[in-house]
Amino acid sequence: MSYPNPPPPPKGSASFSSSSSDPFNQTNQLPYDSQFPPQHAFAHPSAPNPGAGGAGVAPPGQGGQYAPYYDNEPEMGGRWEGGGMGRETWASESGWSQNEPNYPPSDYHGGPGYLPSRASTPTFEGSNAGHRPRDPYPAWTVDANIPLSKEEIEDVLIDLANKFGFQKDSSRNVYDFLMIQLDSRASRMSPNQALLTLHADYIGGEHANYRKWYFAAQLDLDDAIGAVQNPGLNRVRSVARRGGKTKNPLATAQEKSLESATSRWRTAMNNMSQYDRLRQVALYLLCWGEAAQVRFMPECLCFIFKCADDYYRSPECQNRQEAVPEGLYLRAVIKPLYRFLRDQGYEVVDGKFLRRERDHDKVIGYDDVNQLFWYPEGISRITLNDNTRLVDIPPAQRFMKFDRIDWNKVFFKTYLEKRSFFHLLVNFNRIWVLHISVFWFFTAYNAPSIYAPSGSTTATTPMAWSMTGLGGFVATLIMIAATLAEFSYIPTTWNNTSHLTRRLIFLLIILAITGGPSIYIAFFNQTGHVALILGIVQFFCSVVATIAFATLPSGRMFGDRVAGKSRKYLANQTFTASYPALGFYPRVASFLLWFLVFGCKFTESYFFLTLSFRDPMKVMNGMKVQNCHDKYFGNGLCTNQPAFALAVMFVMDLTLFFLDTFLWYVIWNTVFSIARSFAIGMSIWTPWKDIFARLPKRIYAKILATDDMEVKYKPKVLVSQVWNAVIISMYREHLLSIEHVQKLLYHQIQSDQPGKRTLRAPAFFISQSEKGSKAEFFPKGSEAERRICFFAQSLTTSIPAPIPVDAMPTFTVLVPHYSEKILLSLREIIREEDQNTRVTLLEYLKQLHPVEWDNFVRDTKILAEESDAFNGGNPFASDEKEEAKKADDIPFYTIGFKSAAPEYTLRTRIWASLRAQTLYRTVSGFMNYSKAIKLLYRVENPEVVQLFGGNTDQLERELERMARRKFKFVVSMQRYSKFNKEEHENAEFLLRAYPDLQIAYLDEEPPRKDGGESRIFSALIDGHSEIMPNGRRRPKFRIELPGNPILGDGKSDNQNHAIVFYRGEYLQLIDANQDNYLEECLKIRNVLGEFEEFKVSTQSPYAAQGHADFAKFPVAILGAREYIFSENIGILGDIAAGKEQTFGTLAARSLSYIGGKLHYGHPDFLNAIYMNTRGGVSKAQKGLHLNEDIFAGMLAFGRGGRIKHSEYYQCGKGRDLGFGTILNFQTKIGTGMGEQMLSREYYYLGTQLPIDRFLTFYYGHPGFHINNILVMMSVQVFMLALVFLGTLNKQLTVCRYSSGGDILPGQSGCYNLVPVFKWIKRCIISIFIVFWIAFVPLFVQELTERGTGRAILRLCKHFLSLSPVFEVFSTQIYMHSILNDLTFGGARYIATGRGFATTRISFSILYSRFAGPSIYLGMRTLVLLLFITLTVWVPHLIYFWITVVGLCVAPFLFNPHQFAIADFIIDYREFLRWMSRGNSRTHANSWVGYCRLSRTRVTGFKRKRLGLPSEKLSSDVPRAPWKAILIGEIIGPICLAILFVICYLFIKSFAVDGQIQPGLVRIAIIALGPIVWNMALLITLFLISVFLGPCLNSYTHQFGATMAALAHFGAVAGMLVFFELLWFLELWNTSHAVLGIIAVISVQRCIFKFLIAVFLSREFKHDETNRAWWTGVWFNRGLGSHALSQPAREFVVKTIEMGLYSADFIACHLLLALLTIPMFIPYFDRVHATMLFWLAPNQQIRPPIYSFRQRSQRRKIVFKYGLLYLIIQGIFIALIVVPIIFKDVAGLTPKSVPFNGII
């Protein structure tokens, strides 16, 4: 195709006359302000000619009106010499006015003046020279009585583009966008109604966001009253103040009332001409189409549109002669806003954009900017550069002042997302009230001994009433704390804080009422009649207060933000609290669910938790320990040890009180969900015979739109085509062999009547009722069986009826893509990943899909034989020997091809790609929509087939046209223009395979001059786009953006830039690792029917009566099921699949019914107009909106959109398969949830939802994560309680009981701790149940969908594969990631793996990844558990041993081939290297690097200095706020250290052989000794390195490493010496020594954290200081002025590092010892592999094949390092065991301890 240079356009066209036919050219008022504007004649001969243009626009750089925008900018690429464009030039440029937009005739070569952006003009493949394609918008033709022709619509867009300076490509894109929407609607309603409803959805209807915003921001006052009386936008009261001066106050008030304003609005909308309606929609879409990041701010966009609309109707605009330059709108309106948003997060350093170190509460984000436009006060803040307020300018002139707005002065934070745990208090205050207050009521009533008069165990009646009644006091305290915290999250303006202040005053009064009587009763009158009355009244007041606070949303107390009638609350109600109402039955179900949950919870908690705690409280309260004494504290601490223990037990009981609510929620939610599945017929327990026998009838009734067809065609004929297409599609995917296909197809057979043929149905439908016959039709347990069963089962449910294909709405599938695999390369398939991988990908896939591989090979062989025969192969080959044939087949069965010709290798690549998580799989799966639409169109319209006779090409073209019209597929390939050669080839392959696939990508043009910014474009290509000489395709549209659109975490920005290319009414958002199937795609019309827009009322949405038909809340999101296709790929894949199954299906089913489904994950369908007018399909602030999709769900829910769930449609979805990648995903979800807790959406939902929906929201979303925190917290608190109880049990004489349960006589001085031991057992059972309840939903889901056998088998496989260990570990990861995020921040997108986890990961990598989140905690808990086991052993503790060991070893347990002996030893060598490297030269993976990185979340980094390679090793981590550091890093560890030291001091407070032992001094010496020793060692080595280093470094590069090795060896030795000293001082009393170690660890941890938090300044990004310390070379390190201060800082760092090094060294060897034990079991590695991969031992992965040299090398390494490993482990064991053996020989006593008992 050649593109001639465009000729100059005509200089000035017809002049524009300001005709009186335009009702809006005399006034600047909105059309809906006058009661009855005159009817606009849209086809009037004197209507404005939008093709006007004029000369006189200054070219860029030559001054003139627009010079400020263009002098420093490169040209847009438009035509500068002569103003605007007319339709004829626009049409000829785009080449698609008269013909199909994307597919002009093949002889078209670009008309005159072809667009500079070079929009593509692909040829219509295969079209004949004389063939003109059908009309692209068949429902919008002159025959259909359309209100405006395509040409008139085009004119409108050209006119708007000329008036506002929209880009040509953007205008063309919007034209196509708008026409497809009109065509989509007009295909099922009249064209007039289509335009009317479209205008109602975008601009004026009941649910249009623009209309809602218009009234919320009180613009009706601004517009109706006019600029004279109301110069600024003020509140109603401001106008009312001047109301007395008006002549008719009543009329003014009437004008101002909301009802009269909405009535005026409706009248004006009803009277508006269709021309104006179209113009408004077109203008809105043009504003939206170039808005870029402003699309995330829907109300800001509404404001821009309002100003543009006002300006358009002004005489100034209508009389304008010349067209404004192209791109003016982008530069004057969008770019300043974009720059403001960009500069919030980034700053320019050395010409590069660097992320600012700001947390969310300092960043004015999209939501803050958007919220400014909600309120009149916000809009009135907008000022120009000369400080004029924009609202003081007449509405019609505001748009032209946008370039002069100073946005930096306008915006402020509207909600402060501070990192704080108080968000949990504010957002979920009702949860805390409900639990803590009720816990108080239960416990206070059952603990009379605590508040009884001294000497008595029973309290007086008034005291009992009053103390129990303090539950209300507690509830009020929680509410006061929540209110005070709320003050810190919202800006303190009077409007915000007035209702908070009112609430606070009221709460203080209630506090006095619920707490005051207790003071009187407790201190003045415990027994009187008045006291009793006061106590009872107090109790009932408390109950009322508790119920009120637990049920009423705090946003509705004292200034109702949700339902208040005041106009000042309207914006809040409109945008945050327009919750869609539930129907009667769902509401009843919602209340019933929570009544059952809390009914069971409170009953069970009272009897199981509270009553069981009664006896321990009774015996522990008042218990004082006798005969104990401490050297420094006397008996002040030790006598109160039972009180400390009781306090910790209280916290434990309260934690369990929270946990069992979630347990009951899981149980009842599962019951409800299963009941729903039976109600809608989605269960295997529906009669099996019924499912298959009736399948043909159901296909006919539910899949086909066959209202009037039965007369002409038998249902069997139609159904057979659909069924055969499904079966053949499975055959093509190699799921079925040819034999299976023959049995499953409908066959044509000879009829009884001569010359006629009839159809025979497959026996499959009938024989399904006969047991045992299923296996004949498809392989047992195969993918084909699963798909056919689900298809049959899904059609038993009630589903919306389909409408004919040509009437169905158009929809788009959108897939964001970054760097996911497009197609696997041959190298990836047939080569191992690295030396730690034992299997190629193809081998692994063949073992996972043996039947499919077999079918594929058979298929390939047939192909090869045909090819051979065609090429003249031997026709008698079949007579040759069978052996030779078998040998010939080997290559087919091993790699899938024999000839390396591309067509054969490509087949193998595609086969593997369709079974991995690739984009090709996604595209090929979702392109089935196109096949389904063609199939349905052909089946339902047999006359179309007859029309084309035998011309299959023309028939295919007609089917293609219909599919293309109804379905679009856009992949947003963010990196497309930066793809490497292989990626580009793969993308090109996709486009050739699927020419209708569209790819949106970012195209970058370098700056024209130095120091300028690159220009970035949003471009679109498809498989029809012309290929240019450079190999790239010519874009169809290329729209300039204001700057780089990727400002956030990437995904939402990627979706947002491509969203302008979607088409139609609905969007399906898909991830690049999903799949779809033909039989599911056949249900697309039923699925779209769920949006309830197929049968639209014929009334006008604006008519006085008709608007009621449109009052229903629209469906915003339709959720769909996901089948996780990685479910059988070993235990981890199955766990990931199980979680998705339970959350995505089981929970979603019940949540959507009771109106609590928020989660919009993929593959959900979206109402595109609804979502795009409300901020788009996801939110995009970096970090805060990490889980971008759920925010779209919350946004839609809060603004009145319904969220439904579809049970009968499901897509495939891939999940992460490796331990690390699954936990990366969970970390991402956990940190994302932490960010959600900070967000304003949670604030609005938590403080405004009614109680039943609030509970559904809480337990369905954040409750799960908070429950994980509480589960792990309960383990920690319980361990602490048991340590205290262990010290009591160890040191005190415990009373013994008889078998009858009575205390035995003659036990003076004993302590009754038996009730406490019973409580311990009950607690362990509770924690055990809470952990294991996680498996119930999966089991029940499997039971209902696949039957008892499959459910039991799956559960057994999980338990045998140690899945509970993984569950414990993942719970800890969830907890760590949330708490870490709430404390330190740093949430970021973690790219999770999409491959198969077959590679063994080295110990050091796993340790460094999981030490912080879990292993350290596990190791500390292990030491606690050892002490507990030694002092309070009960068999129930075995469960805790499994749990805690799981926390330590889970990462290694799920590591492939962890227990192969040779690999283990070689890995040990790698571990020792990891511990020691990075001190002489930089290394990317070293212990010192890991240590630096783990402390940077506290210290933060210094500013980035470009150029040093080691800087790349660390990512940006913002420094944590000091409050977070104070609580998390200083106060927390100090408290723990104090508690453990108290425990140690207690056991040392009893005299042994008459001698009191000095506990405190001993702990101080053992804890501080190693630190002092390390300091001395460091100073010595520092002096050596400074004096010798500069000389010796020139001789050896190992000097630094040697010094570091000496220091680290000394540190480990010092640690062991001091441990041995403790062991000796305790005289080898194991439990005492273990408790001593616990206390020492806690003290050292406390010291190190304190040093890091207080003494360490920010880290350098590079590691020069570390290497300078060891090598002694401090110059030339790039330290600059820091060279003098760094040695002192580095001394503190090295002191900490030495302590941590020795701790890590010992901890790692303990872990390695635990992992060594299973290796003594023969064949354990094989058993372990079976457990991980679920492959039978005979299918297992072969060991790798090594060369002779490699084998010899490995043997040497194994021998050398194996010996070293045994020696080190032997030393550790000897240090513990040898003293025990010789202690009796030595005969030591306390008196033989040296230093005369000082230590």
Swiss-Prot record:
The keyword Repeat does not apply. Residues 1-11 have a biased composition (Pro residues). It is found in: Cell membrane. Residues 91-101 have a biased composition (Polar residues). Disruption phenotype: Essential for viability. Knockdown of the enzyme increases sensitivity to caspofungin, activates the cell wall integrity pathway, and decreases virulence in the host lung. Its main location: membrane. Residues 12-23 have a biased composition (Low complexity). Keywords: Cell membrane, Cell wall biogenesis/degradation, Glycosyltransferase, Membrane, Transferase, Transmembrane, Transmembrane helix. Activated by magnesium ions. Inhibited by caspofungin and cilofungin. One of its GO terms (cellular component) is plasma membrane. GO terms for molecular function: 1,3-beta-D-glucan synthase activity; alpha-1,3-glucan synthase activity. Coiled coil: none annotated. It holds the Pfam family FKS1_dom1. Optimum pH is 7.75. Residues 51-64 have a biased composition (Gly residues). The chain crosses the membrane at residues 431-451, 470-490, 504-524, 530-550, 591-611, 648-668, 1268-1288, 1323-1343, 1422-1442, 1446-1466, 1527-1547, 1563-1583, 1605-1625, 1635-1655, 1704-1724, 1762-1782. One of its GO terms (biological process) is cell wall biogenesis. Its EC number is 2.4.1.34. It catalyses: [(1->3)-beta-D-glucosyl](n) + UDP-alpha-D-glucose = [(1->3)-beta-D-glucosyl](n+1) + UDP + H(+). Residues 1-136 are annotated as: Disordered. The keyword Glycosyltransferase applies. Catalytic subunit of the 1,3-beta-glucan synthase (GS) complex. Synthesizes 1,3-beta-glucan, a major structural component of the yeast cell wall. Involved in cell wall synthesis, maintenance and remodeling. Belongs to the glycosyltransferase 48 family. Component of the 1,3-beta-glucan synthase (GS) complex composed of a catalytic subunit FKS1 and a regulatory subunit RHO1. This is 1,3-beta-glucan synthase component FKS1.
